[in-house]
């Protein structure tokens, strides 16, 4: 059985990247929450 995590930088950026977050209203909410919390990295 193969492992479930097969890392791909491009897929990772497209689903969890900054532009992906900015594309939707909820994604922008995620960013604002992370800013409020003081996260060093907002996205991947």
Swiss-Prot record:
Keywords: Ribonucleoprotein, Ribosomal protein. The keyword Acetylation does not apply. Belongs to the bacterial ribosomal protein bL34 family. This is Large ribosomal subunit protein bL34. It comes from Azotobacter vinelandii (strain DJ / ATCC BAA-1303). The keyword Chloroplast does not apply. NCBIfam families: rpmH_bact. The gene is rpmH. One of its GO terms (molecular function) is structural constituent of ribosome. Residues 24-44 are annotated as: Disordered. It comes from the Bacteria. GO terms for biological process: translation. InterPro entries: Ribosomal_bL34 (IPR000271), Ribosomal_bL34_CS (IPR020939). Residues 31-44 have a biased composition (Basic residues). Pfam families: Ribosomal_L34 (PF00468). GO terms for cellular component: ribonucleoprotein complex; ribosome. PANTHER family: LARGE RIBOSOMAL SUBUNIT PROTEIN BL34M (PTHR14503:SF4), MITOCHONDRIAL RIBOSOMAL PROTEIN 34 FAMILY MEMBER (PTHR14503).
């Amino acid at each position: 059985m193969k492992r479930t995590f097969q890392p791909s930088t491009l897929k990772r950026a497209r689903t969890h990247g900054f532009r992906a977050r900015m594309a939707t209203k909820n994604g922008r909410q995620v960013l604002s929450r992370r800013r409020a919390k003081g996260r060093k990295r907002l996205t991947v």
